[in-house]
């Protein structure tokens, strides 16, 4: 329902504090030597500032705003602020539902209704928090503490996966929220869900949240390494859940591309051998991401190339056979390109004696 990210037509939650001034970019010096103009304290003042700022263009001279236009603009801005207040109230109502204790003497029907209400609250919050302003407000309302402390470990799988999804939704591309979530110890709990939960949906949503906390987030990646996250990721790739396998392989590939400094760690874990073993399983679209990860692991990394050349792996023969299989299938073009790149990188030269010299 809400626009994603900070873009769209939503107005900012609050004006900047007076100490920051109100200029933005290179055009903010038009006030001359009189200092920064006073910031408006209400909607009427904001409207007046917008009109004044618009009239500073020297050429052509601005036309006076008609009363009809002025009224329309004021109503539109009022509606925007009112909509934001309403969404904050919705989030507060959801948090009231989620904060309630489960009735200790409730019967089966009452417990089912209670769970449905909590699931509905989590779903509405996930919808609202697609907007970055709402996600920030949710965290200011201590919503993240409630999710991490209570709902990631809830007894009902429907609550666990919705909590993981909401954590990921709030954390996407917002460093301040990522840092708060990491500080609450969420990554350890999410990795445990990915590795051990009995519900496939919980595991998929946990992986989504993990991805939002470690991609482009150095502190998150360091925690991921300390918690042996790559081993958890490899085990997820070995499961029978196709969506989980694909998303795990894609995250591994992304981390290898973005953080090549960890290739040595992965090789020491036997990652090359495990990836090749996955390629040997019955063919599926998942193999494209496995081969992509393997390509990333050997690119500009002689240790990875040497391990791929180990005769007992039989990788060269496997890749040549796979190329023959894929050549007539346009839908597997990217996988074919990965196979050809691996052949070129690992098996185009006759020996590896000079690789590190």
Curated annotation (Swiss-Prot):
Residues 1-69 are annotated as: Disordered. The modification Phosphoserine is found at residues 349, 354. Gene3D superfamilies: Leucine-rich Repeat Variant. GO terms for biological process: positive regulation of proteasomal ubiquitin-dependent protein catabolic process; positive regulation of protein ubiquitination. Keywords: Phosphoprotein, Repeat. GO terms for molecular function: adenyl-nucleotide exchange factor activity; molecular sequestering activity; ubiquitin protein ligase binding. The keyword Flavoprotein does not apply. PANTHER family: HSP70-BINDING PROTEIN 1, PROTEIN FOLDING REGULATOR. Inhibits HSPA1A chaperone activity by changing the conformation of the ATP-binding domain of HSPA1A and interfering with ATP binding. Interferes with ubiquitination mediated by STUB1 and inhibits chaperone-assisted degradation of target proteins. This is Hsp70-binding protein 1.
């Amino acid at each position: 329902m809400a626009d994603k990210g900070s873009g769209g037509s939503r107005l900012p939650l609050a004006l900047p504090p007076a100490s920051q001034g109100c200029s933005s970019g290179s055009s903010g010096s038009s006030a001359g030597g009189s200092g920064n103009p006073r910031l408006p304290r209400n909607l009427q003042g904001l409207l007046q500032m917008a009109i004044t700022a618009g009239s500073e263009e020297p050429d052509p001279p601005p036309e006076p705003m008609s009363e009809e236009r002025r009224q329309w603009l004021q109503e539109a801005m009022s509606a925007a602020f009112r909509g934001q207040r309403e969404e904050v109230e919705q989030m507060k109502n959801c948090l009231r539902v989620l904060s309630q204790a489960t009735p200790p003497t409730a019967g089966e029907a009452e417990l089912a209704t209670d769970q449905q209400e909590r699931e509905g609250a989590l779903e509405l919050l996930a919808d609202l928090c697609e907007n970055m302003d709402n996600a920030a407000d949710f965290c200011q309302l201590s919503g993240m503490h409630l999710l991490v402390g209570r709902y990631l470990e809830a007894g009902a799988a429907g609550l666990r996966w919705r909590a993981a999804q909401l954590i990921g939704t709030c954390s996407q591309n917002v460093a301040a929220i990522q840092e708060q979530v990491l500080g609450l110890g969420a990554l350890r709990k999410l990795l445990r869900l990915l590795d051990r939960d009995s519900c496939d949906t919980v595991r998929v949503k946990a992986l989504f949240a993990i991805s939002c906390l470690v991609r482009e987030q150095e502190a998150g990646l360091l925690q991921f390494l300390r918690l042996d996250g790559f081993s958890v990721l490899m085990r997820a790739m070995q499961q029978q859940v196709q969506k989980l396998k694909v998303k795990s392989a894609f995250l591994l590939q992304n981390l290898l591309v973005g953080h090549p400094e960890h290739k040595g760690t992965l090789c020491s874990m036997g990652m090359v051998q495990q990836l090749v073993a996955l390629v040997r399983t019955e063919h599926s679209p998942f193999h494209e991401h496995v081969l992509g990860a393997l390509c990333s692991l050997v690119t500009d990394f002689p240790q990875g190339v040497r391990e791929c050349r180990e005769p007992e792996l039989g990788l060269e023969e496997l890749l040549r056979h796979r190329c023959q299989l894929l050549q007539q299938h346009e839908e597997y073009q990217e996988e074919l390109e990965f196979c050809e790149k691996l052949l070129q990188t690992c098996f185009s030269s006759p020996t590896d004696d000079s690789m590190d010299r």
